[in-house]
C-alpha cells in the first residue's frame, strides 16, 4: 500500500539551492533523519552554505545500502566509492561486502588505490595480479580486519595472499615486509612475531587486542633488548609512552627489571591518562595489575591480609586520593584499614577515578553498603559505574532511578553486566520512566538482548524506529526471536519491501523460516554478514535454491564464509552435489580448524545454540562492527536527482514489488507496484 507524500516543510527549506541534485540530497537526508537534522536555515541555502550544512551533518548520510546503489551506472558508482575513501567514511561489514561485489561486477576492483582500505578486505583476492599484489596488500593492510569476523575464509585468504606477495612464508619478517603487512600481523602466530624485525611493535600497536600467546611473544621481544627502547633496565618514560597500549601488556617479570623511578613515573602517567578519559579503565587496570604484582614481593612493609588489619600507611585523606601513586602506596588491605566512611562519602569520585583492582573495588562496595544500607542515592549512582557489576539484583532493586541519564551511565558498555540490564531498567520504569529511541541508542543494541519481554512491549513503535540499526548478534537466540517479533510488529506496514528489508535487517537473527522464504522471493540479495547471523536452526532448514535466491548477487560470498560455524551447519544438511554447484565442494570442518586466525573468536556460541533445546538462553559472543558514517558530498552535484533519490531511499518502478505487511510474512503481492510519482508516506532511509 502506497500513499502520495505531501511536500514536507523540511523539503521546502532547501529549495533555494544552486544544484538540484544537492537540494534533493539535503531534502532526503533531512526527511529521512527527522529530528537528527540540525542547523538548516528556514530561508534556503546557497551552494556554499549547503556544503557547510552537509559537512556538519555527515552522520545523516550513513544510510547507504546496496540494493538501490546497484542501479547506479559504472562511472557514478566509481565516484561514490572514491568519495567514501576521500572522506574516510567507515562502513559496516554488511555494507562493505555487498559494495565490494557491486564494484567487482562493474570492473572497478582494479582502481583499488582510490578505494577505502576496508573495502579491499572484501574483494575477490583471486583477481589480485602479481604486478599489483604488493600495492593491493599494503593498501588493504590499512583497514580493520575485525570487519571480517564473519568471513573466516576471507581472513585466512588475505593473510595467504599477503605472504605470497612476499614470495612465500618467511622465517623472519623484515622491516619492509612489516611495512607491507600492516595490521595483518595481528593475525599471525606468536612465533612469527618473536622472530620478526623489532619494528613489528608498530604493527602490534594497531591490533585491537593481543592473544595470550601474542602477549608472551611481545614480552619475549621486549626482554631481548633488540627493540628501539633497549633492554628493560635502560627504559625511560619516553620509551614506555612510545609503546602506547602495548605497555599495558608488559609482564610483572619485566617490570621488576625496570628502574623504580621510571616505573613510578610511568604509573603516574597511566593513572593520569585514565582520569582524563584518554585510556580505558580496562586497559589501565591490566597495566596496574601487572605493575602492582611486580612490586608485591619487593615492598616488605606491606602487612599481609591475615596478619592483622591495622592501618600502617596512615589514614587516607582527600589529598591522598588525588595522588596518582595512591595504588602503589595502599594495597587493598590497607585501603580497607585506612579509608574511613566519612572520607569515602566526600571523596567517592576521586577514589573511583583510579583504576582499582577488583579486590579494592569489593572493599569500596562493602564500605558503601555501610554508608547506605538501604540503597545508594541516585546522585551517587552516577559515580559508581565501575562498581555496578558487583551488585546483586536484589541490591539494584533498592535503588531509586528516576532519570534516563542515570540509566545511560549504569548501562554503559563498561559498567553493568548483561544480566543486570533488566533490573536497572525496571527501577527506571517503576518510577514512570520511558524507554526512548535516544536511550536505546545510548545504551547500545546489546542491552536489548537482556530486556524482559514485558519491557520490550513497553517500547513504543515510534521510539523503536528511532533505535537505528542495533547490533544484536551477541543476544541469546530466544531474545533475537523476541526482538524480531517486536521489530516485525513495528515495521510490518512498510509499503515497499526493499525499505522493509532495510529496517528489519538488524533483527533477522530471530526471523522464522517463512520470513526468510519471503525475502528470498523478494530478490533483496541479503549480504553475507546478515546471513551468517541468522538462526542456525532456521538456516539449516533452508534449501539450496532458497539460499541461492536469498543471497542473490552476493551468493559468491558463501565461499568467503564457508568455515563459519553457521555455514558449516547448513552445509552438513545438504548433499555435496548441490553444494558443488555453488562452489562449496570440499569438507569445511578440516579447513576451519586448520586455518583459524589467532584473533578470530570461533566458534561463537550461536553454533552451540543451534544444538541446544529451544529456549536456551546461552550467550553468544560474536563481535560487532565499528560505527558507520557515509559521505558522498561530491556526488551531490554530479548525480542526477533521480539517481540520488535511488541511492538514498527509493528503488525504480518495477524493480521491487510493494506489499502491505501483516502480522505474518506473506508472499509478494501480485501487481502491487509503487508508481514513480508516489512515495510511501513513512520514509526512513
Swiss-Prot record:
This is Mesothelin-like protein. Residues 1-32 form the signal peptide. The keyword Disulfide bond does not apply. It comes from Mus musculus (Mouse). Coiled coil: none annotated. It is a single-pass type I membrane protein. Keywords: Cell adhesion, Glycoprotein, Membrane, Signal, Transmembrane, Transmembrane helix. Glycans are attached at residues 315, 400. GO terms for biological process: cell adhesion. One of its GO terms (cellular component) is membrane. Disulfide bonds: none annotated. Residues 603-624 are annotated as: Disordered. PANTHER family: MESOTHELIN-LIKE PROTEIN, STEREOCILIN RELATED. Residues 649-685 are cytoplasmic. Belongs to the mesothelin family. It is found in: Membrane. May play a role in cellular adhesion. The chain crosses the membrane at residues 628-648. It holds the Pfam family Mesothelin.
